């Protein structure tokens, strides 16, 4: 079977909907015993902290009959100067796949180039593809469809914004991205998303108007304003994003049955207020749970051969 990497949401362009449907089926049969990945070994290399991604990946591979090996970069020879390429060649001899959470996307690409096994981007500075499977799985569960939905991301034009645009475009969802001026998503991702959206009959709208994005939205999504590694920008970003907080006033512009989503962790009182995060419209913990089921879907798709 040919090696397949998932470094970007675009690597699931042809089967994202299929993976989501598989994930929903795996969730429905969560108490069934699976041995489809028996004896398969997943390596986890995490340069950044993780609660949901690491835990869900470890549980996911275990529930499918395989095993996870956590590799702390500071305890590997990577931390002493061994190249990513050499590391990839060696780990390919021991493992069946690697999930890599990195500060720099270039390192994820380099690892994938040097391995003979699948590499999964478990979050880097430009994308978070695993989160997208869980997010749109949640949308499918709550809304029952993708076509005709207005999905609004309001916040920083970061890695989540990049990946959400691509995921929405692939699935035919209209997406609005509202950010302060100067914090828009990278143009290369906007261009890629618009090209896919054109093919799939949906649209990608970039705006600086949070109310425009929230108006009649079916989904309102946000993420932290200060990403990992950006702590020095806290004061600057908090000032710039004040009008982009997800609060009761802003969501009053959305449809009454809108759902609120957040990839977590949430900085309550900054990008979202408690009354929204804890409202009946909030699905953030269902969304978090779906990290497990969606990653089972991804791993099954990559490794069940």
Swiss-Prot record:
A biological-process GO annotation: citrulline biosynthetic process
Entry binding sites for L-ornithine: 159, 223, 227-228
Keyword Transferase: yes
Entry GO terms, CC: cytoplasm
Superkingdom classification of source: Archaea
UniProt KW keywords: Arginine metabolism, Cytoplasm, Transferase
GO-annotated molecular function: amino acid binding; ornithine carbamoyltransferase activity
InterPro entries, per database record: Asp/Orn_carbamoyltranf_P-bd, Asp/Orn_carbamoylTrfase, Asp/Orn_carbamoylTrfase_sf, Asp_carbamoyltransf_Asp/Orn-bd, Orn/put_carbamltrans, OTCase_ArgI
Positions of disulphide bridges: none
Keyword rRNA-binding carried by entry: no
Enzyme class at the top of the EC tree: transferase
Localization annotation: Cytoplasm
Enzyme nomenclature, EC number: 2.1.3.3
Binding site residues for carbamoyl phosphate: 50-53, 77, 101, 128-131, 263-264, 291
Reaction equation(s) it catalyzes: carbamoyl phosphate + L-ornithine = L-citrulline + phosphate + H(+)
SUPFAM superfamilies registered for this protein in UniProt: Aspartate/ornithine carbamoyltransferase (SSF53671)
Pathway annotation from the record: Amino-acid degradation; L-arginine degradation via ADI pathway; carbamoyl phosphate from L-arginine: step 2/2
Family recorded in the similarity comment: Belongs to the aspartate/ornithine carbamoyltransferase superfamily. OTCase family.
HAMAP family according to UniProt: OTCase (MF_01109)
NCBIfam families for this protein: orni_carb_tr, PRK00779.1
Role: Reversibly catalyzes the transfer of the carbamoyl group from carbamoyl phosphate (CP) to the N(epsilon) atom of ornithine (ORN) to produce L-citrulline.
Protein name: Ornithine carbamoyltransferase, catabolic
The species this protein was found in: Thermoplasma volcanium (strain ATCC 51530 / DSM 4299 / JCM 9571 / NBRC 15438 / GSS1)
């Amino acid at each position: 079977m040919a090696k397949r990497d998932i470094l970007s949401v675009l690597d699931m362009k042809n089967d994202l909907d299929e993976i989501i449907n598989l994930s929903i089926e795996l969730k429905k049969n969560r108490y069934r015993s699976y041995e489809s990945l028996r004896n398969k070994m997943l390596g986890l290399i995490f340069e950044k902290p993780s609660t949901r991604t690491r835990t869900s990946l470890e549980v996911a591979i275990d529930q499918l009959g395989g095993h996870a090996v956590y590799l702390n970069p500071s305890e590997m020879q990577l931390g002493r100067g061994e190249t990513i390429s050499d590391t990839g060649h060696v780990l390919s001899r021991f493992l069946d796949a690697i999930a890599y959470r990195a500060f720099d996307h270039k390192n994820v690409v380099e690892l994938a180039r040097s391995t003979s096994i699948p590499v999964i981007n478990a979050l880097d500075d430009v994308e978070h593809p695993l989160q997208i499977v869980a997010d749109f799985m949640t949308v499918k569960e709550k809304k029952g469809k993708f076509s005709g939905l207005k999905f609004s991301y309001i916040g920083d034009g970061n890695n989540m914004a990049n990946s959400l645009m691509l995921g929405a475009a692939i699935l035919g969802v209209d997406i609005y991205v509202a950010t302060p001026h100067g914090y828009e998503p990278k143009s290369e991702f906007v261009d890629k998303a618009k090209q896919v959206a054109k093919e799939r009959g949906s649209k990608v709208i970039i705006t600086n108007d949070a109310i425009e994005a929230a108006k009649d939205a079916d989904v309102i999504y946000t993420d932290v304003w200060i990403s990992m590694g950006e702590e020095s920008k806290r004061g600057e970003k908090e000032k710039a994003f004040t009008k982009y907080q997800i609060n009761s006033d802003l969501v009053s512009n959305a449809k009454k049955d809108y759902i609120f989503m957040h990839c977590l962790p949430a900085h309550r009182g900054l990008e979202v207020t408690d009354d929204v995060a804890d409202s009946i419209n909030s699905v953030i913990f269902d969304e978090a749970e779906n990290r497990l089921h969606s990653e089972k879907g991804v791993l099954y798709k990559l490794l069940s051969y």
